[in-house]
Structures are given as structure tokens and as C-alpha cells.
Amino acid sequence: MPDANEVKPKKGWSNPALRMMGIPRISLPSRNWMIFWTVVTTIGGGIAYDKYEQKQMRKKWMDAVKQFGEVSYGANEIPRKLSIFIAPPPNDFLDESLKLFRKFIKPVLNAGVVDFEIFSESRQGDIRASVAEKIRELRRKQLVEETPKKNESNGNQDNDEEELKSRSDLYKAKDVLGLYKVFPADINVKSEDAIDDSSAGGIICVGRGAYKEYLSGVHEGLLGPLEKPQSVIDEETKLAEEKKKEKEENPDKDDDNDEEQSNLKPVPLRYIKPEDYANAQLAPELDLSTVVKDDKGVPVFFEQPVYTFPLPNLVGFTNIPRKIYRYFTKRFLVDDFGERTATIVNNKSRPFVYKDVLMAKEEEMDWPKKWVEKGKERNSEWVQELEHDERVTSRMKVFE
């Protein structure tokens, strides 16, 4: 009778030659090992397949615009240039937005030989304030050029003071060094954006928040006053005093992020509120009967087409299943963003219409609910409805 404690030999296949070489019997792994290797292989295979498809999708859209990269430019010519505004996702860091731009948008722009300049923000309102200030500077400059100088009107009769000029205005290095005589004259650099007003440059907003701030900044710059109103100054002073008082009452509440924010200048408040758009005058200093251009003959940024990329960013414990699905299907995101970027490189635009105010609106569905509620309490710019004035948007264009 066989012993109950006797272990039955494990089933498997064996070869005498292999046994003499010290190789044990070949058999299937245990049930637990089978489950482990099945899970590892499935997950690893899914990740590897998705990354392979990402490369294929990226290559497809890079090849779709490579004909633009084959265009040769002269020594005095520079290609088209975009302005890119990038904002961090709600309740997340700016690095997430920059990572998305580098992986999904930048390769197609590089393949199409499109130059770009990035403007990013670390706080809400930075993009809006920067855009509005650029337009105000343009208006101030135009106002100074149109206003005759007092010295010229008086014929400089009453001006007995010696007028000082910088050395660079009097002469340049090549005027005093004979070596520069062997070189040709100054190269007159021409931008591709100055050739055709309808296809000049372009604006890309990465994130619904960046688009809201850009559009609000354009309205503030064109419809708002040139100087900060007294009501805005009083409100900023009041907010600064409240913040200082709160900091004194709760000194232990400050963290590293608060210390970094306190070292920065506060974001300027709006010079004009959205409800006052209709009663405001549209940039009287600028000649809006034609396309407004800079000193180089390039249409200014608010005259250029605009496009917005939604930020597919999920946070929160309840969104973990959706995050897992998106992680294994990034190839669809690469394909979508590649197609959108190729449209921008192809440089086809149309007039701005009402529905374009809702560009990337689907991104707001992913915003954390608690963050949105907190933003409404603080009167955040991102959670407010985007107001617009037809006098401003009628001059704008969007990529199609």
C-alpha cells in the first residue's frame, strides 16, 4: 500500500541527453506562476503595442507635412512663427502640459519647419495680463507717434538744453573698423509672415484655461483703458491688505508654494469687466480699418489665426479606471493631436464664428468638481463663462 506522505513525481517531459547535462525535467509552471506571467505579458504587450502605434501615428503626420520641410529659405529669410500659450491643468503642474506639447505637438511642427515661441504661466491670469499689456503697449506706441512733440511744434526755440544721443545712434562698430568693409552691407531679414497677411503666424493655446485667458486678454487690451483705473487700484490694495492680515493671523499655514507665490508680483486685475465690453470704445489709437502690423510688416498676434488643444488630464481616485484606459490608448491621442497640428501647419483658416468661443469646451468635463467649486468661491477666471464682443472676434480667425 503506497505511503500517504509519498509525493508523486511531477509530470513532464525529459530527455536522457538533457538529464546527463544537468537540465531538469521540462514541465509547465504552476497555476500561480501561469497567472503571474499571463498578467505581466498582457500588460507589457499592451504597453509595447501602444507605444509602437504611437510612433507610427507620429510618423504618419510628420510625413504629411514633410513637404514644408523641403522648402529652402535664403540667408535673409525666416520661416513662419507661431505664438504658443501653455497653461497647467487644473489642480496639477505645468510640466504635464509641457510634456503633452513636447510629445504630441512639437514633432509635427518641427517636421513642417514652423518656428514657435512659448509663453507659459504658473498662476491664473498671467497669460491674460501679458496679452492685454502687449496690446496696450501697441496702443501707447501708436499714440506717441501720432502726437506731435512739443519741441517740434515750437521749432525747438525754447529748448536750450543740450540733446544727448547714445553712441549707437551716432555710429556703429563697422563705421570705425576697416575690417567690416570686406563684408556685405546689412542683411535685410524678411519674415514669411510678412508676405501674406491672411496666412501670417498663428496662435496655439494648450488648454481651455489658456484659451480663456488669451481671449479675455485680447478683449481687455482692445476695449480697456490704457492706464489702470482707480477702482482697480483700490481693489488690488484691498486684496493685498486682506492677504497680509490673513498671513499674520495664520503664520503656520504657509507652505513652500505660498512662499514662492508671495515672492512674485500679484497678477494684475482686469482693467475692464466683461459686462462693460458693450459700452467700451474699440482701441481708438489703432487704425482698425486695415490689418494692424508691427514694425517688420507682420500682422500683430491678435490678427493671426488661433487654435486650442484640450488637455486630457484626469485627477482623483474615482477616475482611476478612465486613467488606466487612456494610458493604454495614447495612440488615439497622438493621432488626434497630430491631425490637429497638421491642420495648423497647412495654414488654412476661416473667420471666427460664435461656436469658436467653445473651443476645447470638452476639457471642462474632466476638471475636478471640488476644484471648480473652490474656483467659483474665489471668482476664478477659468470657471466663469467666456464673454466676448463681436467687434473684437470679427477681426479674429481660427485654423480649420
From Swiss-Prot:
Mitochondrial matrix compartment residues: 1-32
Region named Disordered: 143-166, 240-266
Record's GO cellular component terms: cytoplasm; intracellular membrane-bounded organelle; membrane; mitochondrial inner membrane
Main location: mitochondrion
Extent of Basic and acidic residues compositional bias: 143-152, 240-250
Keywords carried by this UniProt record: Membrane, Mitochondrion, Mitochondrion inner membrane, Protein transport, Translocation, Transmembrane, Transmembrane helix, Transport
Mitochondrial intermembrane-side segments: 50-400
Membrane-crossing segments per the record: 33-49
Localization: Mitochondrion inner membrane
Known function: Essential component of the TIM22 complex, a complex that mediates the import and insertion of multi-pass transmembrane proteins into the mitochondrial inner membrane. The TIM22 complex forms a twin-pore translocase that uses the membrane potential as external driving force.
Similarity annotation: Belongs to the TIM54 family.
Subunit structure: Component of the TIM22 complex, whose core is composed of TIM22 and TIM54, associated with the 70 kDa heterohexamer composed of TIM9 and TIM10 (or TIM8 and TIM13).
Name of the protein described by the UniProt record: Mitochondrial import inner membrane translocase subunit TIM54
Species: Candida albicans (strain SC5314 / ATCC MYA-2876)
